[in-house]
Amino acid sequence: MLGNYYFAIVGHYDNPVYEKEFNQQMKMDSNDHRHLNQFIVHAALDLVDESMWGTTGMYLKSVDKFNEWFVSAFDPPLSWIIDPQFFLDLTSWMRFMMLHDVKNDDGIKNFFSDVYETFIKVLMNPFYEINSKIKSANFDKKVLLAAKKHILP
């Protein structure tokens, strides 16, 4: 489906851990547009936190709408990764957020699932510091492949 997509992984302290924009031309938009995307996603975080209590699934489709943009989210269960002897509140630990201008629920859900599998591998890396930015070129490439497979034509 043709459309514009902005994907972000938001950390425990509402910090951006990873960001990626996808559009028809596969080029980055201006900085102003990027800041607007970040603002819309950040504004929708409270709605995601409220919505996750009303469902048993991890995928939350169209949690919010801003003009022509929809916000979808994926709230993965990550508590099993941390050693159980340490207590951390992981109920709102990491959230995957997608800002998009076309309805593509199945594609976005499948994209989230593929990226989640790759994200788990990043978290299992002993050199990755939890809640820090993901700078791996390999992770970036796998996210792009998942996008081409599920949300881009």
Swiss-Prot record:
Family: Belongs to the TRAPP small subunits family. Sedlin subfamily.
Major location category of this protein: cytoplasm
Annotated keywords: Cytoplasm, Endoplasmic reticulum, ER-Golgi transport, Golgi apparatus, Transport
Gene Ontology CC: cytoplasm; endoplasmic reticulum; Golgi apparatus; nucleus; perinuclear region of cytoplasm; TRAPP complex
Higher taxonomy: Eukaryota, Metazoa, Cnidaria, Anthozoa, Hexacorallia
Location within or outside the cell: Cytoplasm, Perinuclear region; Endoplasmic reticulum; Golgi apparatus
Domain of life: Eukaryota
Keyword Transport assigned: yes
Bridged cysteine pairs (disulfide): none
Designated name of the protein: Probable trafficking protein particle complex subunit 2
Protein task: May play a role in vesicular transport from endoplasmic reticulum to Golgi.
Entry-linked SUPFAM superfamilies: SNARE-like
